[in-house]
Amino acid sequence: MLSPSMVPRSEGIDVASVSLGAHHGALLSRAGQVFTWGCADHGRLGHGSQHHISAPLRVEALAGMRAAQVACGDLQTAAVTEDGQLFVWGCAPTHAAVYVARSLA
């Protein structure tokens, strides 16, 4: 059994909530910023790269917006802004790319 451990380089982030997918995670800061880390396959991290990220990295495509919620699926991530906009990035279960409102992958 694994024991709990701190996510690397997350100490400076005031975390409001977290969501975990099959091989990636997303967190929402109290300032409304979205951070993702883990397996980047299928664009699920929203950083425009397929490289694994070992520590939370801010999703720059959402800069200037305040997110209110974040959620992870197996191959996708979603965020809802405080003004009700929905952003989804990654891959649908059919392995088709998913882009709602704005491309982040």
Question: Residues of each region from the PLM?
Answer:
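Eukaryote-biased RCC1-like beta-propeller repeat architecture
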Residues: 1-105
